[in-house]
């Protein structure tokens, strides 16, 4: 593989190398590219994830500009790269030491609605390229949840891949999705003596994303080959954690004398050394001259319970806040904003948000609780009457807030929304209540609203009707006809009638309108659902072959847009349809309903 660049140069958390779609990795140009049989090094011609970052280089975490042709370009390039490769037979290890890297995962497929072989006979080369070309955060929270489950599934590695490299690809995508703890579960599932150079690099990144410098110690002997400038600092930190304080201090001072690394990076390593035994070291961290939050700086600062400056977090990608939300090093009150970002992405569940808000409630001085979000959430559960509970819910939804905060509000209030009985008098709140129920996956509770919403026949009830038409398991009692859809379209004020397009695409993909009705609506609104592209052929082929994992991965690749409203109806139709045909109808329904809530 290509020569590794050190983490201190290539680990920009807000770098340009992944086109603002994920943290810049510690990995060298060419990470994840097709490799010859491990471990023999050889050049590769596949495009790298992006140009390596230079010291201090950063690109603020601005939203990605929509480029709907990007998916097709990626798939075309993927097909060109996906050539067959010979795989060296795995090394034999004693039975009492072996954990088969070809069967790494923590979720049994049957428990998450997947077949035993979700990748089928798909080429590992093709799948690997799609994995590394998929960036987070995705436009759909439920698409991320579905993809995370597939990546964590304990299934046999697809044909034509070095098993450890397959784990590395999956863990790397999980990091790009903000799923640091999920990535750690994968990395922990294989023995370090089976690590390839690629796996070593990803494992180092995973340790830093999890604020776990001790996790680097298991890689200490392999790091010099792939991260030569990083290795001495890791050696010093591990020596300190092992109780060898004098040796650790000497290693740090030697690195400082060499002067080859930025002072902030040595100082942070020194702070970790100071946390060990028998070091007697006190280190002051000067953030003022620092304008870039690298993975190294994030990982070591949070490992020592030091929150990075807000200005650096603001410039970082959303994935970094998701890492922070899951970090155990900070009290709940310091992680509220990060947790909202993580909830909107799909990293934090509804139950996790309730737990976090409850911890923040307990941590906050009673005299300062009034008007805070933890106080509102408590009122949403135990308010003295319905109006007080609804008032608290409205405060958490934040109708006038940004999309991320609104989605986070729905996720946080999912369980509290169950306590509000369906009532026609709540027409103005019905869409938020139903959106919250679907955000938490409570489709059965949302179905209680069908009879009430069926009586809504104006714009105020349109979105609630559309979400129920798409999201409930059996929409019995809900009118889903061409006329009702056209009424929705007539009142649709979204730009380019995006909601109408997503509604028709979702209903057609779920099979809730017959092909003739879908065809007439497609022609009337110019949706282009009958158009064929490289991507549609691939995902339809995966569905036909019942490759549930491949279908989920390709569906997620179609959700790479700034907002779900910018996902073309064509992609939504084929994604939902493919998931339904591969036994993942529950996820398909949630993706479709979420699209109408957020568009």
Map each language-model feature to its residues:
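N-terminal propeptides/low-complexity segments immediately following signal peptides
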Residues: 20-73
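Solenoid-like repeat scaffolds
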Residues: 96-98, 110-121, 135-136, 151-160, ...
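Generic helix N-cap/helix-start motif at coil->alpha-helix transitions
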Residues: 160-167, 192-201, 226-234, 261-267, ...
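Residue-level signature for tetratricopeptide repeat
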Residues: 173, 202-207, 238-239, 435-436, ...
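Structural motif corresponding to the intra-repeat A-B loop/turn of tetratricopeptide repeats
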Residues: 177, 210-211, 242-243, 440, ...
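Solenoid-repeat scaffolds in large eukaryotic assemblies
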Residues: 180-183, 213-219, 245-251, 445-449, ...
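Extended amphipathic alpha-helical segments with heptad-repeat/coiled-coil character used for oligomerization
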Residues: 215-308, 462-469, 480-482
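Extended alpha-helical solenoid scaffold regions that build the rod-like backbones
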Residues: 296-472, 477
């Amino acid at each position: 593989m290509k020569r590794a660049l050190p983490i201190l140069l290539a680990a920009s958390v807000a770098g340009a190398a992944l086109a603002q779609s994920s943290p810049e990795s510690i990995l060298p140009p060419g990470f994840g590219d097709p490799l010859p049989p491990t471990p023999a090094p050889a050049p590769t011609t596949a495009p790298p994830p992006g140009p390596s970052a230079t010291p201090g280089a950063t690109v603020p975490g601005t939203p990605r500009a929509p480029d709907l042709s990007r998916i097709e370009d990626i798939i075309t390039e993927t097909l060109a790269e996906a050539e067959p490769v010979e795989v060296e037979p795995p090394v034999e290890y004693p039975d009492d030491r072996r954990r088969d890297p070809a069967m790494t995962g923590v979720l049994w497929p049957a428990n998450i609605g997947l077949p035993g072989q979700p990748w089928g006979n798909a080429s590992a080369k093709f799948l690997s390229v799609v994995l590394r070309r998929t960036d987070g955060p995705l436009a759909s929270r439920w698409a991320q949840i579905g993809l995370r489950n597939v990546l964590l599934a304990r299934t046999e590695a697809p044909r034509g891949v070095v098993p450890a490299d397959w784990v590395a690809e999956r863990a790397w995508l999980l990091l790009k999705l903000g799923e640091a703890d999920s990535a750690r579960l994968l990395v922990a599932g294989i023995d370090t003596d089976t690590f390839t150079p690629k796996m070593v690099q990803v494992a180092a990144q995973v340790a830093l994303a999890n604020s776990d410098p001790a996790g680097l110690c298991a890689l200490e002997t392999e790091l010099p080959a792939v991260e030569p400038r990083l290795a001495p600092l890791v050696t010093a930190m591990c020596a300190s954690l092992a109780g060898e304080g004098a040796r650790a201090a000497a290693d740090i001072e030697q690195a400082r004398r060499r002067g080859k690394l930025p002072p902030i990076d040595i100082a942070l390593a020194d702070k970790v050394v100071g946390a060990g035994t028998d070091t007697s070291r006190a280190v002051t961290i000067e953030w003022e001259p620092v304008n870039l939050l690298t993975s190294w700086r994030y990982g070591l600062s949070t490992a020592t319970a030091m929150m990075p400056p807000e200005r650096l977090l603001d410039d970082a990608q959303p994935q970094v806040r998701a890492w922070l939300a899951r970090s155990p090093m900070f009290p709940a009150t310091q992680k509220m904003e990060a947790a909202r970002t993580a909830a909107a992405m799909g990293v934090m569940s509804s139950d996790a948000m309730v737990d976090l808000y409850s911890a923040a409630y307990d941590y906050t001085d009673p005299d300062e609780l009034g008007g805070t979000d933890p106080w509102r959430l408590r009122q949403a559960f135990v308010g003295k009457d319905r109006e007080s509970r609804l008032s608290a819910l409205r405060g958490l939804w934040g109708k006038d807030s940004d999309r991320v905060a609104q989605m986070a509000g729905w996720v946080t209030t999912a369980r509290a929304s169950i306590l509000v009985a369906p009532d026609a008098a709540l027409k103005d709140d019905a869409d938020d209540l139903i959106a919250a129920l679907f955000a938490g996956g409570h489709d059965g509770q949302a179905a209680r609203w069908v009879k009430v919403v069926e009586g809504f026949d104006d714009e105020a009830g349109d979105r609630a009707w559309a979400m129920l038409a798409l999201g409930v398991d059996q929409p019995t009692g809900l009118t889903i006809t061409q006329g009702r859809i056209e009424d929705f379209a007539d009142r649709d004020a979204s730009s380019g009638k995006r909601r109408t397009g997503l509604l028709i695409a979702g209903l057609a993909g779920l099979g809730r309108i017959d092909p003739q009705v879908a065809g007439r609506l497609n022609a009337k609104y110019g949706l282009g659902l009958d158009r064929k592209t490289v991507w549609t052929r691939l995902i339809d082929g995966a569905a036909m072959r019942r490759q549930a994992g491949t279908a989920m991965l390709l569906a997620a690749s179609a959700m790479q847009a700034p907002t779900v409203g910018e996902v073309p109806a064509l992609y939504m139709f084929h994604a939902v349809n493919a998931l339904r045909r591969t036994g993942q109808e529950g996820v398909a329904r949630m993706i479709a309903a979420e699209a109408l809530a957020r568009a």
